[in-house]
UniProtKB/Swiss-Prot annotation:
Predominant place of localization: secreted
Keywords: Cell wall, Secreted
GO CC annotations on file: extracellular region
Subcellular location(s) of the protein: Secreted, Cell wall
Protein's name in the database: 76 kDa cell wall protein
Length: 18
């Protein structure tokens, strides 16, 4: 993804930080 910690494997633009 765009960021390092893809917590749930979601290819979000922030890797699901919010």
């Amino acid at each position: 993804s765009t960021r390092t910690p893809e917590f749930l494997g979601l290819d979000n633009q922030c890797g699901v930080w919010a």
